[in-house]
Amino acid sequence: MEQHTPRHRPSGQYAAADTRRAAIIDSALALFAKAGYLNSSLAKIAAEAGTSATVITHHFGSKQRLLMAVLEARDERTMRTFGELGPDSGGDDVRALFREVLALAAYNLTQPGLIQLYTKLSAEAGDPAHPAHAYFAERYERVAHSLASALQRSFDAGQLRPGTDPESIAREILAVSDGLQVQWAIAEGRLDFVGLYRAHLDRLTQALTVDGQGLDEPAGAERLP
């Protein structure tokens, strides 16, 4: 009986496909950030990427799946740089935690398209029918839980004042961060996001810690050059 050797796609074809997918994701990110998801058609994304809507459908299946690929790419970039704050991230120093949060905010400013994407989509996703609604709902819960868990370690270590509610503080930090991101985007980058965020975290550290001291780093240390 004749045996057939399975045909495998050459590695060069895989690389070309990956490159094409990455280019489509970058183009979709730029268009979603500028016009929002609802006002971005596959035809417009294809024109931005220099390809066709058929090619995009071949790689992603639908605009909704492309959106999720864009959001996942955003998270992967952040994870590669900072990892995940959470119960297993180690450490109980609240100042180290806040400095890491501040460094993440500064890193995000190096990718203004991602901030514009996030602020635009998070506003749209308030509608339960929006395809990114579940993503943002899950993400807020996950990030709030991670921050609250890290703050709980600081509380258990005796760094924070009695009566501190880690969950409430985590939600406050997220609210301030998101609010400043919106203002930064509207001001087209002219707002001193990092300086304002650092000032808030410094006041928060003084209010929460038993020793009443602020962040250890000198003012402006985390500012972008």
Question: Over which residues does each language-model region extend?
Answer:
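Hydrophobic/aromatic-rich alpha-helical bundle segments in the mid-to-C-terminal region
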Residues: 116, 129-141, 156-204, 208-225
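Amphipathic alpha-helical segments used for helix-helix packing
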Residues: 110-131
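Hydrophobic alpha-helical connector segments
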Residues: 69, 82-115, 166-173, 220, ...
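Helix-turn-helix
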Residues: 2, 20-23, 27-69
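Short, basic, alpha-helical segments at the C-terminal edge of helix-turn-helix-like DNA-binding modules
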Residues: 72-79
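Amphipathic alpha-helical packing segments from all-alpha helical-bundle domains
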Residues: 79, 83-84, 96, 112-113, ...
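N-terminal intrinsically disordered/low-complexity leader segments
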Residues: 1-19, 212-225
